[in-house]
Amino acid sequence: MVVPALIYMFFNYDKPGLIKGWAIPIATDTAFVLGILSFFSRHISLELQAFIIGFTLIDDAFALIILALFYTKTINTPALLISSVIIFILFILNYRQVKQLFYYIIVGLLLWISMVESGIHGTLCGAIIALFIPVNIKGEFNTSFKKLENLTRPFVNYFILPLFVFMNSGILLEYFVFKGTCSNSILALVYGIIFGLFVGKQLGIMLFSYPFVKFKLCNLPSDTSWLKFYSISILGGIGFTLSLFIGSITFESSCPSNSMRAAVIIGSLISALFGVAVLKYCTSKE
């Protein structure tokens, strides 16, 4: 997350109107990365799968936190206090190991309303609710949790995610050709996002992982070479939906907004194609 943000800032440090987009390339689209890796499932060990899910979810969680902390324009203090009380109620439900989903749905709906009214983006609400739904109750797996997952997964995969992509990637093809006075003034925005996603993500993951393995603080996942691990780090540059979402909140005027969308799509596609090519090469040798 740090390296993509720094690369974006390098291109835009002297542009006050554009520097605020530093959070756009930090996110990883978990759904798209896992979708691509599903085609290579036979060659991806369980340990590597756990690492992939872990770093993509952590990326998304921090992106939501950054969204709440740095992209909130005004704070409604009374509504924020109400949100805090509702979160405490969720804590009590979890502590008492209440497994009925009805209570979490009702309390979650109230939390969403209060958070939106407080000025904090409502997307953070879903992450908070998920933290408090108990997975294990008295040492046994919570079947209600599994039912909720099974109930929402088709709806999310086949309706919410495609709709989200469609609504957030509404750009004209002409914006893929960066020309004209508008484009010239924000070319640094485009470079910052593309290089942040494609170069920043892989560089960040490798720079933070290699020293830990080198000094034996941790090990590579089983059946994983450095080249295969590198291919996963490249796929981390698929920002797509969450990057588009952060960008749409950051830039409201049409010129930077459309250029931002084109840059996110280009950076994500380059990361996907190059990552798949390297991963395909690795698996062909096995």
From Swiss-Prot:
GO terms for biological process: regulation of pH. Keywords: Cell inner membrane, Cell membrane, Membrane, Transmembrane, Transmembrane helix. It is found in: Cell inner membrane. Pfam families: Na_H_antiport_1 (PF06965). Its main location: membrane. GO terms for molecular function: sodium:proton antiporter activity. It is a multi-pass membrane protein. It comes from the Bacteria. The chain crosses the membrane at residues 21-41, 50-70, 75-95, 101-121, 122-142, 158-178, 186-206, 229-249, 262-282. InterPro entries: Na/H_antiporter_dom_sf, NhaA. One of its GO terms (cellular component) is plasma membrane. Belongs to the NhaA Na(+)/H(+) (TC 2.A.33) antiporter family. NCBIfam families: NhaA. This is Putative Na(+)/H(+) antiporter NhaA homolog. It comes from Rickettsia felis (strain ATCC VR-1525 / URRWXCal2). The gene is nhaA.
